[in-house]
């Protein structure tokens, strides 16, 4: 089965896309000022999204475990199985890193540092500009706060849109994952039924062989010769009917 047709790679691509969006949203979340009340809301949604992606990775690992029981049936080898295990492990690590970063409250210091410098400059105007600061400082500060607030709100809006899209992607992956799981279970059931049928057929053949052996033994040498002759005549008749008519 090619990679384009393999359900594993379809789900893998969806999950990787979700992880990329999650990391992008996380990096934007790091730049949100802690003073913004929406930071906690976005953090909560990030953690929830991490949990959803981890669930998808769990389902994919279950599918790998099922495929590992009979790789030849699914057209894969041990090297491919190991490759898939490494990918799921790496995906889980990426999600765990984002989740740990959110829970630890690690935010970049860029915006905070800029605000601190701004406040220092406001508190320490030079003597030549003191009067101008008294006149316009408050207005500049209000404008800066408003601009910073607008930037933060725009950033939060973008994150909400990305989280909504990420949630839809996770739901879509969940549906595909469940479909794959159901298909694997159905195939495993078919294999079990085939094994049972083969065992039953084998038992019937052994029974027939024993019966034939008993009949041959009871018939003796003369009876065996007569049976062989009968089978030979029957074979000749069938040959004539099939190939000469």
UniProtKB/Swiss-Prot annotation:
The chain crosses the membrane at residues 225-245. GO terms for molecular function: SNAP receptor activity. InterPro entries: SNARE, Syntaxin-6/10/61_N, Syntaxin/epimorphin_CS, T_SNARE_dom. GO terms for biological process: abscisic acid-activated signaling pathway; exocytosis; Golgi vesicle transport; intracellular protein transport; plant-type cell wall cellulose biosynthetic process; vesicle fusion. CDD domains: SNARE_NTD_AtSYP61-like, SNARE_Qc. Belongs to the syntaxin family. Interacts with VTI12 and either SYP41, SYP42 or SYP51 in the trans-Golgi network or with VTI11 and SYP51 in the prevacuolar compartment to form t-SNARE complexes. Core constituent of the SNARE complex required for membrane fusion at the trans-Golgi network. Also observed in the SYP121-complex and cellulose synthases. Colocalizes with PIP2-7 and SYP121 in trafficking vesicles and at the plasma membrane. Interacts with SYP121 and PIP2-7. This is Syntaxin-61. It comes from Arabidopsis thaliana (Mouse-ear cress). The gene is SYP61.
């Amino acid at each position: 089965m090619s990679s384009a047709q393999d359900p594993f790679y379809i789900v893998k691509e969806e999950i990787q896309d979700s992880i990329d969006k999650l990391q992008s949203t996380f990096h934007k979340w790091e730049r949100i000022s802690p003073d913004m009340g929406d930071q906690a809301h976005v953090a909560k949604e990030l953690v929830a999204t991490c949990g959803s992606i981890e669930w998808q990775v769990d389902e994919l690992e279950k599918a790998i475990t099922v495929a590992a029981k009979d790789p030849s049936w699914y057209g894969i080898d041990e090297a491919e199985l190991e490759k898939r295990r490494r990918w799921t492990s790496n995906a889980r690590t990426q999600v765990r890193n984002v989740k740990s970063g959110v829970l630890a409250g690690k935010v970049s210091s860029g915006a905070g540092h800029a605000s601190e410098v701004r406040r220092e400059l406001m508190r320490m105007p030079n003597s030549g500009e003191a009067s101008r600061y008294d006149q316009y400082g408050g207005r500049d500060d209000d404008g800066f706060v408003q601009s910073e607030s607008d930037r933060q709100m725009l950033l939060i809006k973008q994150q909400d849109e990305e989280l909504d899209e990420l949630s839809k992607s996770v739901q879509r992956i969940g549906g595909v994952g469940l479909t794959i799981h159901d298909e694997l279970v159905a195939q495993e059931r078919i294999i079990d039924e085939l094994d049972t049928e083969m065992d039953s057929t084998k038992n019937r053949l052994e029974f027939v062989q024993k019966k034939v052996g008993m009949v041959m033994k009871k018939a003796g040498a003369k009876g065996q010769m007569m049976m062989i002759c009968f089978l030979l005549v029957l074979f000749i008749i069938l040959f004539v009917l099939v190939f000469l008519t």
